[in-house]
């Protein structure tokens, strides 16, 4: 089919004339040719070690993991995090601020979490799921991978003046709960 207006900014005129489309925008109704980038075939699954997991802002973690071997990737590359079945209580989360950024105030973000009443929240995940995260580290950093992750809270219910009774973000809650 014809390219959608939402797809056009992502391609050159030549690519559009060659029929390029975004996979997330195409409804497949007939046979089509798909080109898969070479790096997709080199995908590996690793168990990683959490090196650090500090808050760098009220609702953002700098999550640093170490993988068992170096990975060749380009800027803008991403990894997938596998989230197992789990039950995460926000009251158990450590929101210590990054010691390099706030050396004299490790509890810098606690008051904001108190004010937003985040501590009673709970995330329950009943099945293994995967989520993609863009890497904030450089390939030259070897086996350490850094992700900047924002906590995904439930929507705010203005009538109740509290969080809606829905599950918080599965992956962000899981990542926020991880400790070295």
Where are these regions (language model features)?
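Signature of N-terminal electron-transfer/Fe-S-associated modules in redox systems
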Residues: 1-66, 83-84, 122-138, 147-148, ...
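FAD-binding FR-type
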Residues: 66-74, 78-180
